[in-house]
Amino acid sequence: ALGVGPGNTPVIMDSSCDIQKSVYSVIHSKTFDNGMICASEQSVTAIADIYDEVRAEFIKRGCHMLNKKELDMVREIILSPAGTVNPKIVGQPAAEIAKLAGFEVPADTKILIGEVTSVDVSEPFAHEKLSPVLALYKAKDYETALQMAEQLVSDGGYGHTSSLYINVNEKEKMAEHAARMK
């Protein structure tokens, strides 16, 4: 086996992407083995003009958008005191993580999603979570989304994984993504 260390797998959903397929793909990946695979998505950054549709699609497919109180409760359990992923959440179902945080969600909840704004290391949702917990960011445009993804990769460990959901005819944007994700 070849290991490359921690990863923080940011995803960008460009305005040109197929939203239904993109959201389905993230859910499929994030729920396989309850997100324990290091290449599973840790955050989704949606461009502002599709953000509401992306958010609604996640909800429609059984994901739970954390309210402010729940968001803070989950923030408290994502990381261990040492600043690494909390082993108590790794590979646990979303409902168990919610219970650990102190609230209830339906047992069939697929992912706990925190709508956050900061990609700084001070934000627990900006870290690798190895569980069905996902950060959701809104970027005003594609360039901003790339900058956010660059920061997440930089803080999470170069040389791992990033994803882009985009129309295949957007060659320049795809090339820019490939050049900037290290």
Model-predicted regions and their roles:
Residues 1-120, 145-147:
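ALDH superfamily catalytic-core signature
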Residues 103-182:
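Conserved C-terminal structural/oligomerization subdomain of aldehyde/semialdehyde dehydrogenase
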